[in-house]
């Protein structure tokens, strides 16, 4: 957990004055429903207790100054002249400010200091946490009236258009609407959601493989293009469909031999994953943890074989986790090509599970995994207001 008191003091040291506000936006781990959000589908994430915090004060001019405490790097730009930077982290912030300006919001400049304990490049949505935290900070400093849904869409738009990653809406929505001790079943078409309590007897265990992947440079955008191509191909038989979310498994099976690879496999994953997300949420609501775990295992097999976003070392982590006592299910989480796995584990077995998984991974690969239990947390909000902690 980030120490907001320390963040306040670091802001004071850097800018010579205390911050007006400190905002926190969480990372996320998706329990099931992977690569479905940009297909108008269903996802089932939790906001986690790792977050990005922004300490900030308003300025009287139109200049934005940003210090990234973790990177020991700075950015400075004018709200009136926002251009792309050759520093990747700059563009997430600049893109959000540009999105707010383009939406017609009146903005003043700001001095900001940013810190995060969401691992970068691990698939826990460090980028969305940053985008949402920055957007919410500007909302607070400028007394804007932006609904949570609009805030998430602005943040997503910044990543799509300014950063150049065609992400879906899940990461930004869970960063905004996350609820402590709950997962959210989100409909990524109409942006409605339902909070589902997490059973207290199980723990959400995340394993960071330390196989880093840069989302913008990966095959993520290619997968999205393949899904769009699959929709266009299926529209010759089903002209009413707008996205793979509209296709049933029976409809896909009826024309699977007429759909070329890899489009057939990509569509098969998305269509079946939507079913698994809905069934998984219903299973947890009913207290059927075993069924949820089985669906997690099926999800990973689909990501590995049909969506082809896993790697051999990730598969090793997943199959090892699935074999350990107390583990109900395990899968790749996030965009893939490295990053993290998520497992649902009986609380009484967590410490043995962590030790055995870390040991097996190190023995097999020589790498040291970081394994931690995630607590489902609330979405974006203020943790300090006018330099005072929130009650």
UniProtKB/Swiss-Prot annotation:
Which residues of this UniProt protein bind ATP?
A: 121-127
Q: Which parts of the sequence bind substrate?
A: 34-37, 220
EC numbers listed for it are 2.7.1.6
Active site, UniProt feature: 171
**Gene Ontology cellular component terms for the protein in this record:** cytosol
Look up keyword Disulfide bond and say if it applies: no
Q: Where is this site: Transition state stabilizer?
A: 28
Q: Which UniProt keywords apply?
A: ATP-binding, Carbohydrate metabolism, Cytoplasm, Galactose metabolism, Kinase, Magnesium, Metal-binding, Nucleotide-binding, Transferase
Which terms in the Gene Ontology molecular function aspect does this entry carry? Answer: ATP binding; galactokinase activity; magnesium ion binding
What is the protein's major site of localization? cytoplasm
Q: In which pathway does it act?
A: Carbohydrate metabolism; galactose metabolism
Q: Which InterPro entries match?
A: Galactokinase (IPR000705), Galactokinase_bac (IPR022963), Galactokinase_CS (IPR019741), GalKase_N (IPR019539), GHMP_kinase_C_dom (IPR013750), GHMP_kinase_C_sf (IPR036554), GHMP_kinase_N_dom (IPR006204), GHMP_knse_ATP-bd_CS (IPR006203)
One GO term (biological process): galactose metabolic process
Catalytic activity reads: alpha-D-galactose + ATP = alpha-D-galactose 1-phosphate + ADP + H(+)
**Which residues does the annotation say bind Mg(2+)?**
127, 159
Cell location: Cytoplasm
Entry-linked NCBIfam families = gal_kin, PRK05322.1
To which protein family does this belong? Belongs to the GHMP kinase family. GalK subfamily.
PANTHER family per UniProt: GALACTOKINASE-RELATED, MEVALONATE KINASE/GALACTOKINASE
Q: What does this protein do?
A: Catalyzes the transfer of the gamma-phosphate of ATP to D-galactose to form alpha-D-galactose-1-phosphate (Gal-1-P).
Recorded protein name is: Galactokinase
- Which species is this UniProt entry from? Roseiflexus sp. (strain RS-1)
Annotated gene: galK
